[in-house]
């Protein structure tokens, strides 16, 4: 039998300082503040950020009052845009709000006398995906892309002396070589990292300002040495920390790879000053990095009555629990809804030929409806989606994150709430029982 050729697959991630992610984080911060005061809030909040300004737009139905100015500015400052030289600064940027009341036509289809029969907030299809690339059941290229940027941000926030030139904006990309027969990762093929930075003079050229160095050595020489220093730090600080954070089996894949660091040669102008940021423009980064499928609906700024968000989380939960239970090695789940209708109009499953015990995809899809209650109200209750839990989802992915509980203030009371509940594996026993798996 002829062995299939190995193949390459690539995914990217962006940092919390990427302009589109700044917009996502602003939208989810505002959503959280509405839910903190009024868990029944209906919110659809879009954000736009550019040089020196933020505009917040959308529809809201809530009893809460949210200080938009304070929420936006604190989010921007937390990310790290707190210097005038960035041309986008949480302390001085303009903040405009164009939030208005939600359409009564939409609201009457969502809210029902019987809360359990709450209708879907819109029509559409949502996808969930899981595979065995990583212990979190996520595709390896996206997992590594997220992790590299989380480590980079951690250095910038907590150990700035290690790479003191770092600015908030960054992008990463990992290309993974896969075995053509088993479809398992073989090695890391290529890493791309573009990280925004100050204009600085490396120690190799002496102690002086950038302007003085350019005058003495010429700009080409100074910029070359500057990028050489950044690359050296990536190779000796960042990549070793990445490998140390990985399980041993995965860390062994990170060797003899191609590395591109700031391949344009310079990345000083960035963030919302370099590119306009909009909510919902990084939906592939937010989900599976191009693996599986995507229904097109963004997440950030949307309360859980919007099935774009809540049903996508439910689909991920189902796919992950199916793979963890041993139903298949890879699984894609599609849920589809009609606006104002509680139950999904369809459930679709694709296991890419990896289903166990002769199970058919149609049979798996049928059983999903028996195991999981996919009405929006039940999804919301199961994952605690009326709590202010969305801020952490708005950077470094909504899927594949470690679930945890934390005390938060809701309606003036401290309570313990679940974050990333859709990543729990608490339905594995029920799935095994339903499919007769030991």
Please annotate each region the language model reported:
Residues 50, 330, 338-438:
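Internal helix-turn-beta structural module
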Residues 16-35, 130-153, 302-326:
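Alpha-helical support elements that line or immediately flank enzyme active sites
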Residues 41-45, 170-176, 257-261, 327-338:
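A short glycine-rich, hydrophobically flanked beta-strand micro-motif that places a catalytic Asp/Glu
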Residues 12-14, 18-23, 118-135, 268-293, ...:
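Conserved phosphate/anionic-ligand binding catalytic regions in large, soluble enzymes, centered on
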Residues 227-325:
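Glycine-rich anion/phosphate-binding loop at the beta-strand->alpha-helix junction
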Residues 10, 70, 77-202, 219, ...:
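Glycine-rich, mobile lid/loop segments that gate access to catalytic sites or pores
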């Amino acid at each position: 039998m002829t062995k299939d050729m190995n193949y390459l697959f690539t995914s990217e991630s962006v940092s919390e300082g990427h302009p589109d992610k700044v917009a996502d984080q602003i939208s989810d911060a505002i959503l959280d503040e509405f839910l903190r005061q009024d868990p029944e809030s209906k919110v659809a909040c879009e954000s736009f950020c550019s040089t020196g300004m933020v505009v917040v737009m959308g529809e809201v139905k809530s009893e809460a009052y949210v200080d938009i100015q304070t929420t936006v500015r604190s989010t921007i400052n937390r990310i790290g845009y707190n210097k005038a030289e960035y041309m986008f600064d949480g302390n001085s940027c303009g903040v405009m709000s164009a939030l208005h009341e939600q359409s009564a036509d939409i609201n009457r289809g969502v809210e029902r006398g019987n809360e359990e029969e709450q209708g879907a907030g819109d029509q559409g299809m949502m996808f969930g995906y899981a595979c065995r690339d990583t212990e979190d059941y996520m595709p390896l290229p996206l997992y590594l892309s997220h992790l590299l940027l989380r480590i980079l941000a951690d250095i910038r926030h907590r150990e700035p002396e290690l790479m003191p030139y770092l600015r908030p904006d960054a992008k990463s990309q990992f290309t993974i070589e896969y075995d053509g027969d088993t479809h398992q990762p073989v090695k890391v093929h290529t890493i791309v990292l573009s990280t925004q930075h100050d204009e600085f003079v490396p120690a190799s050229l002496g102690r002086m300002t950038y302007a003085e160095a350019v005058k003495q050595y010429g700009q080409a020489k100074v910029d070359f040495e500057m990028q050489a220093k950044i690359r050296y730090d990536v190779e000796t600080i960042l990549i070793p920390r990445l490998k140390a954070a990985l399980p041993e089996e995965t860390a062994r894949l990170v060797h003899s790879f191609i590395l591109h660091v700031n391949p344009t040669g310079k990345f000083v102008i960035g963030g919302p000053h370099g590119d306009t940021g909009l909510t919902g423009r990084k939906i592939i980064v937010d989900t599976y990095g191009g693996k599986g499928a995507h229904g097109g609906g963004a997440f950030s700024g949307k309360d859980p009555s919007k099935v774009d968000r809540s049903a996508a989380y439910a689909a991920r939960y189902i796919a992950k629990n199916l793979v963890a239970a041993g139903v298949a090695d890879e699984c894609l789940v599609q849920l589809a809804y009609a606006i104002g209708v509680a139950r999904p109009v369809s459930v679709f499953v694709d296991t890419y030929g990896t289903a166990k015990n002769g199970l058919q995809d149609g049979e798996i899809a049928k059983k999903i409806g028996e195991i999981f209650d996919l009405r929006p109200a039940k999804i919301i209750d199961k994952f605690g989606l009326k709590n202010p839990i969305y801020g952490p989802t708005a950077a470094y992915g909504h899927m594949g994150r470690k679930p945890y509980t934390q005390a938060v203030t809701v309606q003036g009371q401290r309570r313990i709430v679940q974050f990333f509940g859709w990543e729990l594996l608490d339905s594995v026993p029920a799935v095994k029982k339903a499919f007769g798996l030991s």
